[in-house]
């Protein structure tokens, strides 16, 4: 990998190919829309999708054909504002929502801009990501952070917004029981948001004991490590061990693993709600008999939509969700590749990359 240029104007962390990255000085992006702002990126979290592009060069139909800046979980400081910007000023600390919709297509007009057919999402080919010194966004996709939220915490607003959207899809009500499959960052945040919504029982499920130990200390009321058994058997154990009666009210999969999907369907009571938030193989088997005979509400969840980022910031500022505990490492910008290696190795919960030193 090429070394960092300390005199660069807009140093960027660029993926050239599988396991091939470099530091590259790129032009400082221009503000071409009067409603846009230029943000000096200060912290960026590493997402599983970033690591997947680094390891494989593609995710499904999204293939890295040209050099691409990685990163999309970011926070920063407003460096410059367009002439029509009214809600932000230079020096404001912001959480950065990294997907810009067209605002004109049918999903956008229906209020579901996360499903925009022309979405320009950071670090999704062909669009560059936020692991650069500067990045331009519309002002309404930058969320001013209150003084109670640090810039490090601000970078976690992205995965927290994913969790917020999943929980909103689930329609969780106070007193309900929720089983969350996958105790990675998004799964852990789903546990926290579910509790904030009033869930009385939140059971985290994972195959890694270390993650379950963290989940229990963080937000889960109970944990479950699946045995090498049939999904129906594991589901019954979850129900019995947690006194869930005829089954859980809500099951959320944040893993994308086929056994978790099966167990999630079987762990639900009749009329329960299942939300698929994790992505795995494009096609898997599915227990349609259980889904039909229990008349389950089965939903997907993709990224985040209208109001999700704002709610994420509110949950943290109100003290209802703690994201600071998830940050287990911060590395300098010049050590970005090492951070990717650590995430691939499963070290820590959430690693942040600090912004380029001025």
UniProtKB/Swiss-Prot annotation:
Pathway: Carbohydrate degradation; L-arabinose degradation via L-arabinitol; D-xylulose 5-phosphate from L-arabinose (fungal route): step 4/5. Its cofactor is Zn(2+). NAD(+) binds at residues 182-187. Zn(2+) binds at residues 47, 72-73. Its EC number is 1.1.1.9. Xylitol dehydrogenase which catalyzes the conversion of xylitol to D-xylulose. Xylose is a major component of hemicelluloses such as xylan. Most fungi utilize D-xylose via three enzymatic reactions, xylose reductase (XR), xylitol dehydrogenase (XDH), and xylulokinase, to form xylulose 5-phosphate, which enters pentose phosphate pathway. GO terms for molecular function: D-xylulose reductase activity; L-iditol 2-dehydrogenase (NAD+) activity; zinc ion binding. The keyword Mitochondrion does not apply. Keywords: Carbohydrate metabolism, Metal-binding, NAD, Oxidoreductase, Xylose metabolism, Zinc. Belongs to the zinc-containing alcohol dehydrogenase family. PANTHER family: SORBITOL DEHYDROGENASE (PTHR43161:SF9). This is Probable D-xylulose reductase A. SMART domains: PKS_ER. It catalyses: xylitol + NAD(+) = D-xylulose + NADH + H(+). Binds 1 zinc ion per subunit. It comes from Aspergillus niger (strain ATCC MYA-4892 / CBS 513.88 / FGSC A1513). One of its GO terms (biological process) is L-arabinose catabolic process to xylulose 5-phosphate.
């Amino acid at each position: 990998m090429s070394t960092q240029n300390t005199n660069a104007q807009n140093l960027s962390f660029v993926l050239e190919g599988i396991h091939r990255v470099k530091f590259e000085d790129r032009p400082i992006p221009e503000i071409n829309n009067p409603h846009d702002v230029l943000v000096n990126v200060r912290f960026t979290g590493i997402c599983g999708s970033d690591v997947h592009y680094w390891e494989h060069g593609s995710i499904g139909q999204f293939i890295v054909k040209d050099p691409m800046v990685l990163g999309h979980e970011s926070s920063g400081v407003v460096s410059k504002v367009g002439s029509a910007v009214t809600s932000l000023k230079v020096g404001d600390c912001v959480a950065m929502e990294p997907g810009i919709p067209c605002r004109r297509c049918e999903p956008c007009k229906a209020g579901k801009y996360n499903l925009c057919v022309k979405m320009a999402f950071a670090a999704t080919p062909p669009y560059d990501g936020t692991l650069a010194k500067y990045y331009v966004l519309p002002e309404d996709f930058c969320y001013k952070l209150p003084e109670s939220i640090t810039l490090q915490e601000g970078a976690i607003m992205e995965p927290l917004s994913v969790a917020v959207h999943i929980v909103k899809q689930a329609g969780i009500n106070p007193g309900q029981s929720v089983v969350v499959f996958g105790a990675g960052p998004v799964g852990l945040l789903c546990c926290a948001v579910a509790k904030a919504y009033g869930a009385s029982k939140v059971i985290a499920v994972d195959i890694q004991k270390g993650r379950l130990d963290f989940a229990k200390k963080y937000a889960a009321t109970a944990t479950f490590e699946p045995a090498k058994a049939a999904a129906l058997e594991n589901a019954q154990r979850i129900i019995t061990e947690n006194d869930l009666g005829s089954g859980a009210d809500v099951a959320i999969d944040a893993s994308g693993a086929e056994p978790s999907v099966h167990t999630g369907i079987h762990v639900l009571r009749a009329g329960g709600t299942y939300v698929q938030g994790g992505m795995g193989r494009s096609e898997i088997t599915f227990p349609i008999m259980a889904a039909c005979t229990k008349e389950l509400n089965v939903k997907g969840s993709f990224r985040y939509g209208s109001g999700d980022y704002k709610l994420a910031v509110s949950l943290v500022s109100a003290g209802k969700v703690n994201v600071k505990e998830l940050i287990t490492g911060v590395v300098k910008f010049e050590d970005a590749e090492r951070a990717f290696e650590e995430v691939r190795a499963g070290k820590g919960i959430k690693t942040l990359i600090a912004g380029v030193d001025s």
